[in-house]
Amino acid sequence: MSQDFGKLIRQARKNKSYSQRELAKILKIDFTYLSKLENNRADYAPKEDIIRGLARNLDLDEEELIYLAGRIPHQEEELLKQHYKSMPALFRRMRENPEFAEKVLQQASNTEEK
């Protein structure tokens, strides 16, 4: 999990004036697990439904939070499965050629804005 994930949900929880116990009860999770998430000490990333619950209750962007947690949203996961043979080559090329990576990411951002 990204270190930013824990900091983000902790700060958002405090901004909403929730205690860990209150938010955990809303999410139907143990407050000790929420504490581990906030401190980046959880043994595994939370499930997508928990992340979406955090986002809804803390007024955070669901997709961003899913990525920060180290997960891939279900719809993107399906796309990756459909094109699984192309992914290693794409990621390798992006790693080896930062300009190409920037171009791909910029084009993706421009497409989302339209």
What are these regions (language model features)?
Residues R56-E62, R93-R95:
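Intrinsically disordered, low-complexity basic tails/linkers immediately adjacent to helix-turn-helix/homeobox/MYB/SANT
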Residues S17, K25, R41-R56:
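Short, basic-rich loop-to-helix N-cap that marks the start of a DNA-contacting helix
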Residues K7, Q11, K25, K36, ...:
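DNA-binding alpha-helical recognition surfaces that contact promoter or target DNA
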Residues S17-L37:
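Short alpha-helical DNA-recognition segment
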Residues E38, P46, A69:
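DNA major-groove recognition helix of helix-turn-helix
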Residues M1-N15, Q107:
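A short, Lys/Arg-rich alpha-helix, primarily the initiator
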Residues G70-K114:
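Interfacial/linker helices and their anchor residues that mediate assembly or domain coupling
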